[in-house]
């Protein structure tokens, strides 16, 4: 493994229809990835893909915070647990789950309920927490401080400023194992706040991701994103951290192996 995409959606269109094309590129650049669920249906697809390509893909299963009002809580909890029990060896994380206050705060209590349910599943089964946090970093800091997870926590699509980075880094003082997954946003010219934050985040806490098919990095902005475009994220992170690209690749792969590919 030379590259790792910690968070992609090969289980979603338009990637799913052209997955063989992407898998060929996985092999070409020696890439592995997490295929991330956002609801029960595409979590099941993520598992099927991980079973079909076990040397390249792991599945993460969960309910996105923006979808919590669309599903039945008890039924979803039961089905998530069943999906996990029947496919444990192919699943790396619970998620993406978390809090999203960007569009509305109407479903805060429901997001809390689904967070606690998925948090418990991850902790009980010793799985990584793949967190989606948008406009809710004070909330996640408070809840992680209170719950003190024993399993690693990934801040998916971390694109915040240095102040939020410092606050989240302080969770290390509570012996919480945290990682910052950096998306293609880092390649954007207007991402200076993220660049400054990256400078203070230790490399041993970094992962790379695409969140494909969204958040396409430069030089492909405006087009569909693919997991193989993670190479552009890694090279940009290396430049910002003033580390050779080969060394940055080695560090990120080491972090990924620690979490997912033992």
From Swiss-Prot:
A divalent metal cation 2 binds at residues 96, 132, 156. Its EC number is 3.1.-.-. Pfam families: TatD_DNase (PF01026). Its cofactor is a divalent metal cation. It is an enzyme of class 3 (hydrolase). A divalent metal cation 1 binds at residues 7, 9, 96, 211. InterPro entries: DNase_TatD-rel_CS (IPR018228), Metal_Hydrolase (IPR032466), TatD-like (IPR001130), TatD/YcfH-like (IPR015991). It comes from the Bacteria. Keywords: Hydrolase, Metal-binding. The keyword Metal-binding applies. One of its GO terms (molecular function) is metal ion binding. Belongs to the metallo-dependent hydrolases superfamily. TatD-type hydrolase family. This is Uncharacterized metal-dependent hydrolase MG009.
């Amino acid at each position: 493994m030379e590259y790792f995409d910690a968070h992609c959606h090969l289980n979603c269109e338009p990637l799913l229809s052209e997955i063989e094309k992407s898998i060929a590129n996985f092999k070409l650049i020696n890439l592995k990835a997490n295929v991330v669920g956002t609801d029960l249906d595409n979590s099941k697809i993520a598992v099927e893909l991980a079973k079909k390509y076990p040397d390249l893909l792991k599945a993460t299963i969960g309910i996105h915070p923006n979808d919590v009002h669309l599903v039945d809580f008890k039924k979803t909890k039961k089905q998530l647990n069943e999906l996990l029990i029947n496919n444990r060896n192919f699943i790396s994380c619970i998620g993406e789950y978390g809090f999203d206050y960007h569009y509305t705060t109407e479903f805060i209590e429901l997001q809390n309920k689904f967070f606690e349910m998925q948090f418990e599943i991850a902790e009980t089964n010793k799985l990584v927490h793949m967190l989606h946090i948008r406009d809710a970093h004070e909330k996640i800091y408070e809840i992680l401080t209170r719950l003190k997870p024993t399993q690693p926590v990934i801040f998916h699509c971390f694109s915040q400023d240095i102040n939020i980075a410092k606050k989240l880094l302080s969770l290390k003082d509570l012996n919480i194992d945290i990682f910052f997954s950096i998306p293609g946003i880092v390649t954007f010219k207007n991402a200076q706040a993220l660049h400054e934050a990256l400078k203070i985040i230790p490399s041993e806490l970094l992962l790379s991701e695409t969140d494909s098919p969204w958040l396409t990095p430069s030089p492909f902005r405006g087009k569909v994103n693919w997991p193989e475009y993670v190479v552009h994220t890694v090279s940009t992170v290396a430049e910002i951290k003033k580390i050779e690209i080969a060394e940055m690749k080695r560090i990120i792969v080491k972090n990924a192996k620690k979490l997912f590919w033992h």
